[in-house]
Amino acid sequence: MSTATFVDIIIAILLPPLGVFLRFGCGVEFWICLVLTLLGYIPGIIYAIYVLTK
């Protein structure tokens, strides 16, 4: 795991959509993460970490 990935994961824990946005831009991953975060903070975190580490 690189330092950039580690920083992305820390950002994803604090603000899940921001972490995904910084990596993928305004793509489908961002919108899925945003919806999951609005429905519940924990699902947004789980999805963000999953997407950032795959």
From Swiss-Prot:
Induction: By low temperature. Also promoted by abscisic acid (ABA) and dehydration but is not a general response to stress conditions.
InterPro entries the UniProt entry points to: PMP3
Location in or out of the cell: Membrane
GO biological process: hyperosmotic salinity response; response to abscisic acid; response to cold
Keywords associated with the record: Membrane, Transmembrane, Transmembrane helix
The keyword Transmembrane appears for this protein: yes
Protein name (database record): Hydrophobic protein RCI2A
Organism expressing this protein natively: Arabidopsis thaliana
Gene: RCI2A
